[in-house]
């Protein structure tokens, strides 16, 4: 018998053990093994059985281990695209880790925020990221705090709270500057520029779009070049420089569609901005044609409240 088969046979023997701790450890290891094979339905079943077994121990159950079990459940549920259920499990994991004063709670708060974001529960997502920021020790967890500021800003963008999003991205950028992480600084500049666009400040939007573009060109980073150009286009549009904006939108779109996995949602939004410029230039037929052409894409990639003529 191969070594792996012997190990699995031993785990199943332990699953049958009358000792609760032994059984739970075996179930968790079987869950890890299944997750490693991307068998998340099976991995989830092992985790849930481990939870039921451990809960039956009552006062003997360790909060630390139960927190770990709930984290495993949340991890599996995220991979099964059950994001809201995953967030609830991760929230429970956070509570249990906090009971024992474990710093793991900070990392899992971020994952909880991610899960709520995936579930399109953006306020709950923001709340989780904010708790992670507030519970962190900025002297020892600067990279964690920086990440949570940026993630919180992203949730706020979805809530269209542009001023608050701007504050979070600005703070995140300052922290990533201290960490000398130029790539994420560029991402922050892109989002800061977007916030300024929606706040109607084209000059400030252009400053940060240019910073993002400078990084992308210098680092020869095609992904950030694509996004920086789209931010430059939005900035120019806000400043009324419509032809320059159209040219930059065209460049950004060409780069987007050449990606192996094109960001269709962003492409649709970009095309809507194009149509809006064409209307401002009194080219109504051309604008209508752009909107007609992307209407079928909207049905596939946009949520109901994002469809139709309004800019998103």
Q: Predicted regions: what is each one?
A:
Residues 25, 64-68, 107, 147, ...:
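Residue register of alpha-helical TPR repeats
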């Amino acid at each position: 018998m191969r070594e792996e088969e012997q190990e699995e046979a031993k785990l199943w023997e332990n699953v049958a053990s009358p000792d609760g701790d032994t059984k739970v450890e075996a179930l968790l290891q079987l869950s890890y093994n299944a997750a490693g094979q991307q068998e998340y339905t099976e991995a989830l079943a092992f985790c849930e059985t481990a939870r039921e077994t451990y809960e039956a121990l009552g006062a003997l159950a360790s909060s630390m281990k139960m927190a770990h079990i709930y984290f495993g459940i949340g991890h599996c549920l995220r991979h099964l695209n059950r994001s809201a259920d995953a967030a609830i499990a991760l929230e429970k994991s956070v509570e249990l880790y906090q009971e024992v004063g474990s710093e793991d709670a900070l990392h899992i708060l971020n994952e909880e925020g991610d899960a709520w974001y995936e579930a399109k529960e953006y306020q709950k997502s923001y709340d989780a990221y904010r708790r992670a920021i507030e519970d962190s020790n900025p002297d020892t967890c600067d990279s964690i705090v920086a990440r949570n500021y940026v993630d919180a800003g992203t949730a706020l963008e979805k809530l269209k709270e542009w001023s608050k999003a701007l504050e979070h991205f600005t703070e995140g950028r300052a922290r990533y500057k201290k960490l000398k992480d130029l790539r994420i600084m560029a991402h922050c500049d892109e989002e800061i520029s977007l916030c300024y666009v929606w706040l109607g400040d084209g000059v400030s939007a252009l400053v940060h779009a240019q910073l993002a573009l400078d990084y992308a060109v210098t680092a020869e980073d095609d992904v950030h070049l694509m996004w920086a150009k789209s931010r430059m286009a939005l900035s120019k549009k806000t400043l009324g420089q419509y032809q320059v904006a159209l040219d930059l939108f065209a460049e950004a779109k060409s780069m987007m569609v050449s990606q192996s996995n094109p960001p269709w949602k962003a492409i649709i939004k970009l095309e809507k901005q194009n149509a809006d410029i064409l209307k401002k230039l009194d080219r109504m037929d051309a604008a209508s044609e752009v909107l007609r052409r992307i209407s079928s894409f909207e049905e596939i990639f946009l949520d109901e409240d994002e469809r139709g003529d309004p800019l998103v």
